[in-house]
Amino acid sequence: QGKLSNINGLAVLSQALDAEIPQVGTTTFRPPYTPVTIGALAGEARGVIFQPLRQTPMHAWHEANAAYFEPVGLWRRPYCYPRKGESHGQAVQREVLNTREKLGLLDASTLGKIIVKGPDAGRFLDMLYTNMMSNLGIGKCRYGLMCNEQGFLSDDGVVARIDEDTWLCHTTSGGADRIHGWMEDWLQCEWWDWKVYTANVTEQYAQAAVVGPNARKLLEKIGGLDVSKEALPFMQWTAGKLGGISARVFRISFSGELSYEIAVPASHGAALWEMLHREGAEFGAMAYGTEALHIMRAEKGFIMIGDETDGTIIPQDLGLSWAISKKKADFLGKRGQERKFLADPKRWKLVGLETLDSSVLPDGSLAVAAGSNANGQRNTEGRVTSTYYSPTLKRGIAMALVLDGPD
């Protein structure tokens, strides 16, 4: 309804009605004809606003150690820890190699943490996730996918069963509030008579990932918990005192390396972090940031919500059919995924790519095919979703959605 475009429309209308423009009438003039403030265009980029920036309990340590931060939702997370004379790229490569060869420490406190509790909690989670959660054993963990009603992937994370009627659901860092709201929406509007209670406890805990060949050595040195392969197998968790601090230790990995994630009360986060660095010095302990995290997960072939997904991707596109239960009668997104166009064999599927040299593919690059579509645009057969230089493989790597996928 801006004045500039409306005048042209009124001229066409007056001609059709064989009347003058004043006789046809005008509408109320609205932006962009009237002035628009620069602040309205800048949005959140104009400075500190009502929504406060979120910081982990280890934030002061990151600042003291020259971390370069990046925004993750409202969180500020270390992207890398450049040393004097290092570029960000060099710092990231150093962090990846040290984690692969020795010991890396990651502040994972921003990871979403939602408690789901009650007699119907298992039944509720079976509807929320594509796979079964009600049959998860106490003390065990399971990777789960969430889809919206249309069947498209919306979040993923590891679910741990705490006791008979309590589960801890981990979400993506930027998705905790959204997923908690999604849970409450279903409980309040659809399943209001189910006995389920949820609580977003993300900020109640600090979480540190201890990753690499020396990870177990560090925790054994600190003492207090048996973290041996026999006592704590992969995808299980245990609780107790770790170096005198009450902790939950999860044996999960987002890098392919031996890895433990340690959750402690937020007030003990800084103490835990400093203890890990102090006791881990002899094992080559070094903090790493989000970019090193992303590279290592891509080297392993793990997806990341927001990179490999864009609101139009279903689990089957990413080779995650194994995470969809065939036992359940229903779950959110099941009927959506049964639509015919989602079973089209021409849908792009996820693959891993390696460059033949050390070059890195531009993010979002398209695989261009011969011919053009009805709009005159070149046909495409795929696009790059994530791309990095891998110091482990010493070449560019990428993940992409392409026609025919792995086939």
Mark where each language-model region is.
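Glycine-rich, Trp-frequent "lid" loop and neighboring beta-strands that shape
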Residues: 158-159
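Acidic, proline/glycine-enriched N-terminal capping motif
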Residues: 12-147, 152-154
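C-terminal, active-site-flanking charged/polar segments
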Residues: 1-21, 407
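Conserved, structured C-terminal
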Residues: 2-6, 39-71, 77-79, 83, ...
